[in-house]
From Swiss-Prot:
This is Nucleotide-binding protein Cyan7425_1379. It comes from Cyanothece sp. (strain PCC 7425 / ATCC 29141). One of its GO terms (cellular component) is cytosol. InterPro entries: DUF520, UPF0234-like_C, UPF0234_N, YajQ-like_sf. Keywords: Nucleotide-binding.
Length: 163
């Protein structure tokens, strides 16, 4: 019996949970006394989240609210890639937060290299924005998952298609 088992290492997030986190952030901004009159906007688009507010202090408070709401919805904070704070018209500040999705080739190569050096019986292969890991033993795959979880990656990793 020469069956091989595999799983995919991906970096993804639940879009609906992100929509809910942004919606809850907007509701809290409207209800909090210190943020009510700041005319803050939090806009969600496919490429990222744009926060427009009156000061950097308020921007920090809104980032904290967004992070709290995202964490409560089981979203990793590593999906947020904070851009620089820009001054816009009328003494206002704006920040674009890009959303990280998918494993880029550089991080994919690092994951592959780590697996190849630590586990001789396991074969990693980069497939687009995911890394497929295959082996003849399910136990080897479980060890790979545990090892990858121990590392501090700059992106959020999920393990899918475990077969």
């Amino acid at each position: 019996m020469a069956a091989t088992y595999s799983f995919d290492v991906v970096s993804d997030f639940d879009w609906q949970e992100l929509v809910n986190a942004v919606d809850q952030t907007e509701r809290e901004i409207k209800s909090r006394y210190d943020l009510k009159d700041t005319k803050t906007t939090v806009e969600l688009a496919k490429e990222g989240i744009t926060i427009n507010t009156d000061s950097e202090f308020t921007l920090d408070a809104i980032q904290t609210i967004l992070q709290t709401k995202a964490a409560k919805r089981n979203l990793s904070l590593k999906i947020f890639d904070y851009g620089k704070v820009e001054s816009v018209s009328g003494n206002r500040v704006q920040q674009v937060i890009k959303l990280r999705k998918g494993i880029d080739s550089e991080i994919g190569k690092e994951i592959s290299k780590l697996i190849r050096t630590d586990f001789k019986k396991v074969q990693p292969s980069i497939q687009g924005d995911a890394v497929r890991v295959s082996a003849k033993s399910k136990d080897d795959l479980q060890e790979v998952i545990q090892r990858l979880k121990q590392e501090d990656w700059p992106i959020a990793l999920q393990f899918t298609n475990y077969r």
